Design a protein with these regions (language model features):
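Thr-biased low-complexity repeat/linker tracts and other Thr-enriched repetitive architectures
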Residues: 28, 33, 44, 52-55, ...
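Glycine- and aromatic-enriched membrane insertion/assembly motifs of diderm outer-membrane
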Residues: 8, 15, 207-213, 222-270
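Residues on the lipid-exposed face of transmembrane beta-strands in outer-membrane beta-barrel proteins
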Residues: 162, 176, 191, 212-218, ...
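Repeated loop/turn-to-beta-strand initiation elements of outer-membrane beta-barrel proteins
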Residues: 12, 26, 42-44, 58-59, ...
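Hydrophobic, lipid-facing positions within transmembrane beta-strands of outer-membrane proteins
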Residues: 14, 30, 46, 50, ...
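Transmembrane beta-strands of outer-membrane beta-barrel pores
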Residues: 4, 20-22, 36, 52-54, ...
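Leucine-rich solenoid repeat scaffolds
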Residues: 169-205
Length: 305
């Protein structure tokens, strides 16, 4: 049909049109349209449209549209949308979208988008996006994104992004900033690993490498990380030099207010104008330390390295 194909009730077979296909009931078979495929009830089969694919209730099979796929209830199969895939309730299979995948309730399978994946309730599977992944309740599987992953409930599996957040979890959080609200059974690997009990502590100290240093220590029950910077890696008589450092370590109590800790750190050193006097423009260093700390109060302590 050159312009449009219209079936008021159910359709079993093949619809091919230059503009739009419309089925008032359920469609079983193959639909191909230059602009849109619209099914009032269910779809089972293959649907290919240039712009929009809409199914009022359940969709099962392979659905492709250049712009958007919308399903009122459940979706299973392979769904590919140039911009958006939206399913009102439960979804399973593989969803691929240039912009975003949105599932109103649960999702089982793999969902991949250029920007955002959203699951309103639970996820079992994998979310991969360029910007962020959001699961409203529990997740069993993996989230990978270019900016952030969020799980509103508990997750079992792994979160990989610059920022990872969850209510509770069991597994891995790998990123620059990792956070959980209640409890976590697993391993956090990041520049800052935080929870409601994490103490953010200001540190001021001197040393024989960088002479004057300031840092922020993010301390949990045993493990801690330190982010900071220092000045005058060279002597005070030389021109200005500075460094940035990151350290991760473990602290244990020795006696009452006395604690011992050990950490390993990376240091980036910039010599600035000293490079004109025979010094390298920049240096990199790995440094291990053993520290003794005495807590004078809950907010003040003395550290010797």
């Amino acid at each position: 049909n050159l312009l449009g194909g219209v079936v008021l009730r159910d359709m079993n077979g093949v619809q091919i049109t230059g503009l739009a296909n419309l089925v008032g009931g359920s469609m079983r078979g193959v639909q191909i349209a230059g602009i849109s495929n619209v099914n009032g009830n269910n779809l089972s089969g293959v649907s290919i449209s240039g712009l929009v694919g809409i199914t009022g209730n359940h969709a099962q099979g392979v659905i492709f549209s250049g712009l958007t796929n919308i399903t009122g209830d459940n979706t299973s199969g392979v769904i590919i949308g140039g911009l958006l895939n939206i399913s009102g309730e439960n979804s399973s299979g593989v969803h691929l979208a240039g912009l975003a995948n949105i599932a109103g309730e649960s999702f089982n399978g793999i969902t991949t988008s250029g920007l955002l994946n959203i699951v309103g309730q639970s996820l079992r599977g994998i979310q991969i996006s360029g910007l962020g992944n959001i699961t409203g309740e529990d997740m069993h599987g993996m989230q990978i994104s270019g900016l952030g992953n969020v799980v509103g409930g508990s997750f079992t599996g792994a979160q990989l992004a610059p920022m990872n957040m969850a209510k509770s979890g069991k597994g891995l959080q790998i990123g620059l900033f990792n956070y959980y609200k209640e409890n976590f059974d697993g391993f956090q690997l990041g520049l800052v690993n935080a929870n409601p009990d994490t103490k953010a502590q200001l540190m001021l100290f001197g040393g024989n490498t960088t002479k004057l240093n300031v840092g922020a220590r993010f301390k949990n029950k045993l493990f801690y990380t330190i982010l900071g910077g220092g000045t005058h890696y060279l002597d005070f008589s030389d021109k200005f030099s500075a460094s940035l450092f990151y350290r991760a370590g473990l602290e244990l109590p020795l006696y009452k207010q006395l604690f011992i800790s050990g950490d390993l750190g990376f240091q980036h050193i910039e010599n600035f104008k000293n490079k004109d006097y025979g010094f390298p423009a920049r240096l990199y260093a790995l440094q291990a330390r053993v520290n003794l700390e005495y807590r004078l109060t809950d907010r003040l302590g003395i550290l010797v390295t």
